[in-house]
Amino acid sequence: MSVTVRVPAKVNVQLAVGAARPDGFHDLANVFLAVSLYDEVTATPAADGLRVTCEGPDAGQVPLDRTNLAARAAEALAARYGRAPDVHLHIAKDIPVAGGMAGGSADGAGALLACDALWGTGASREELLEICAGLGSDVPFSLVGGAALGTGRGERLAELEVGGDFHWVFALAARGLSTPAVFREFDRLGEGLDLPEPVADQAVLDALAKGDAAALAVAVTNDLQPAALSLFPELSDTLAAGRAAGALAALVSGSGPTTAFLATDARSASDIAGVLRASGTCRDVRTAVGAAAGATVLD
């Protein structure tokens, strides 16, 4: 027997970042939107402990040891229910690695849900979310999907209404960016500044609720974008190429280096993707639609 769970990527349509806290984290107002790029995590019983394998374009960049969030999720669930984490976790990876789209977090949420189903632990949604929050700031949203406002360090979620489809184009960069490195650069750039408390922008929430891409395009923001561009200046060329191709909005996705472009509709997204592919400013281009469902057990 095995259990396979499909988990979406995310884009941040608002990422407001406060000053560093004493624990090193930052308070956030983080508006997540799940999009239709997916990893699949398959859990299969094993007699010899925990093992992680991976396939996909970026598989060589995925750690297969216990630093992988999928492995940590299985261990956390096993420890909570007093059992051995005897499982083989296989990740079919389509979400970019180190791309600012929560690919690692998706694998953690997927492994957690897959192991819960495989082992019959019957964990409640609240228990699963509690374990997710212990794994990382983005993991709870990977479990929930749809759209949500994350506060605290992003792990406290309030689900949001989405009134229609939003069409996106994602340009994948030639190399990754470390999320901790981007936050360190954010701190460096903001040294001496009095940063405001991060709050959700009502214009973003209203645009999502109405399914209004034009209104969302005006409202999207990412406080980490200057830090990502400081560490990876070439991303400015990708953003410019997408804007010139007709994107309603162009921004760095989360901590980057994936860049995200909001399109009017599916045809516009396809056109923008074609221009970006020909621009020479990125290694690959993907299109997706949001909001997508969260972690889902496949039949």
From Swiss-Prot:
Pathway: Isoprenoid biosynthesis; isopentenyl diphosphate biosynthesis via DXP pathway; isopentenyl diphosphate from 1-deoxy-D-xylulose 5-phosphate: step 3/6. The active site is at 10, 138. Catalyzes the phosphorylation of the position 2 hydroxy group of 4-diphosphocytidyl-2C-methyl-D-erythritol. It catalyses: 4-CDP-2-C-methyl-D-erythritol + ATP = 4-CDP-2-C-methyl-D-erythritol 2-phosphate + ADP + H(+). InterPro entries: GHMP_kinase_C_dom, GHMP_kinase_C_sf, GHMP_kinase_N_dom, IspE, Ribosomal_Su5_D2-typ_SF, Ribsml_uS5_D2-typ_fold_subgr. The keyword Nucleotide-binding applies. Gene3D superfamilies: 3.30.230.10, GHMP kinase, C-terminal domain. One of its GO terms (molecular function) is ATP binding. It is an enzyme of class 2 (transferase). SUPFAM superfamilies: GHMP Kinase, C-terminal domain, Ribosomal protein S5 domain 2-like. GO terms for biological process: isopentenyl diphosphate biosynthetic process, methylerythritol 4-phosphate pathway; terpenoid biosynthetic process. This is 4-diphosphocytidyl-2-C-methyl-D-erythritol kinase. It holds the Pfam family GHMP_kinases_N. HAMAP family: IspE (MF_00061). Its EC number is 2.7.1.148. ATP binds at residues 96-106. Belongs to the GHMP kinase family. IspE subfamily. The lineage of its organism: Bacteria, Bacillati, Actinomycetota, Actinomycetes, Kitasatosporales. The keyword ATP-binding applies. Keywords: ATP-binding, Isoprene biosynthesis, Kinase, Nucleotide-binding, Transferase.
